[in-house]
């Protein structure tokens, strides 16, 4: 029997509403094709919520998210709200409380070069033409960003500042399991990134990851130091499948992966908790300079919806159908203005229509 799922849709600001509209078109297409039902409720978040409710994350929005199986998030922020105190601004006042409230400890950042877009990569042609398809699995709530104690003290030559890198066994185990589960859906390779030659936290990280790996005999586990990993991504990114990283290493690696694709407007992102409840959003920003012009690239938002189907709703076939439709459109040279160069560019809405049509035709 086909499932029914509740989705909280938070379009937000800038290009958020117009790219979210394209995600709706694509979700309509997979609903029809695969027979499940997505009950979608829309809520204000970010700047529009400040304008309408006086705060970036209204109680009604939080309640809508709590009653849902997943959150499909657009983008927030813009010059209109930059005068506000940092904690009242759309980004910090909406995204951080959502991550904290739902205990979203895992960040997933896919990065790939789509066929036909190799020329946008800053990598040498002979490297980019090999292609790559990577998912960075980043631990999001532990490590040096949150460890205590941290601070500054003293003065003069003796003044010092310090941070603490702390990881508990349970934090490493739960993020490792998501990496191995992800690998089972892909090429069955996990690269665990650490600095176990100098850091005690990385030694524990490596030990726990090796223990978890025993539960996934079909998956090949590789360990790699962070400094080598950053170099290998430039030399031959095609060797990687799933990259498992601590918070700070994942911060670095996921941005490097994004940059070597050469098309930031195409990259989705997911943040998950222990129950696989997730928030799914484009990796880019709200792009207020092009908002309302029907020229934004909706692919990142559409691929975020595919991640939602895969990780929170367990609708793998529908997720793949969306990803294949995106690839078909790009391979056919159907591109929005950010990628079309001097060629004919599709509008935001035309791109959404094309991808939905490919799903229905498949």
Swiss-Prot record:
Cofactor: Mg(2+); Mn(2+)
Note describing how the cofactor binds: Binds 1 Mg(2+) or Mn(2+) ion per subunit.
This protein's name: 3-isopropylmalate dehydrogenase
Binding sites annotated in the UniProt record for NAD(+): 78-91, 285-297
Record keywords, A-Z: Amino-acid biosynthesis, Branched-chain amino acid biosynthesis, Cytoplasm, Leucine biosynthesis, Magnesium, Manganese, Metal-binding, NAD, Oxidoreductase
Molecular-function GO term, any one: NAD binding
PANTHER family: 3-ISOPROPYLMALATE DEHYDROGENASE
Function description: Catalyzes the oxidation of 3-carboxy-2-hydroxy-4-methylpentanoate (3-isopropylmalate) to 3-carboxy-4-methyl-2-oxopentanoate. The product decarboxylates to 4-methyl-2 oxopentanoate.
Similarity comment text for this entry: Belongs to the isocitrate and isopropylmalate dehydrogenases family. LeuB type 1 subfamily.
EC number: 1.1.1.85
SMART domains in the record: Iso_dh
Native species: Photobacterium profundum (strain SS9)
């Amino acid at each position: 029997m086909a499932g029914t799922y509740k989705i909280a849709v938070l379009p937000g600001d800038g290009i958020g509403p117009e790219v979210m509209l394209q995600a709706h078109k694509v979700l309509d297409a997979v609903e029809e094709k695969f027979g499940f039902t997505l009950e979608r409720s829309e809520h204000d978040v970010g700047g529009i919520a400040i304008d309408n409710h006086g705060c970036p994350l209204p109680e009604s929005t939080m309640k809508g998210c709590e009653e849902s199986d997943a959150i499909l998030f657009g983008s927030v922020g813009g010059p209109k709200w930059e005068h506000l105190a940092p904690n009242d601004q759309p980004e910090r006042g909406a995204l951080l409380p959502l991550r904290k409230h739902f205990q979203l400890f895992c960040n997933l950042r896919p990065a790939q070069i789509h066929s036909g877009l190799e020329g946008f990569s800053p990598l040498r042609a002979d490297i980019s033409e090999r292609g790559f398809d990577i998912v960075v699995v980043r631990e999001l709530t532990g490590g040096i960003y949150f460890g205590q104690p941290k601070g500054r003290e003293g003065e003069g030559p003796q003044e010092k500042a310090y941070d603490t890198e702390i990881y508990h066994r349970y934090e490493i185990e739960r993020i490792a399991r998501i990496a191995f589960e992800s690998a089972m859906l892909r090429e069955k390779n996990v690269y665990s990134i650490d600095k176990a030659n100098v850091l005690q936290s990385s030694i524990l990280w490596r030990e726990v990851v090796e223990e978890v790996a025993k539960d996934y005999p079909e998956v090949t586990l590789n360990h790699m130091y962070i400094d080598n990993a950053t170099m290998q991504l430039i030399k031959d990114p095609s060797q990687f499948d799933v990259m498992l990283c601590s918070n700070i290493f994942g911060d670095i690696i996921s941005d490097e992966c994004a940059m070597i694709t050469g098309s930031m407007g195409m990259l989705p992102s997911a943040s998950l908790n222990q129950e696989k409840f997730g928030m799914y959003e484009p990796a880019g920003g709200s792009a207020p300079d092009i908002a309302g012009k029907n020229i934004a690239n909706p692919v990142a938002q559409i691929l975020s919806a595919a991640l939602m189907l895969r990780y929170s709703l367990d609708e793998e076939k529908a997720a793949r159908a969306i990803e294949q439709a995106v690839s078909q459109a790009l391979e056919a040279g159907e591109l929005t203005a950010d990628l079309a160069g001097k060629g004919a560019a599709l509008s935001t809405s035309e791109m959404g229509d094309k991808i939905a049509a490919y799903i229905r035709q498949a």
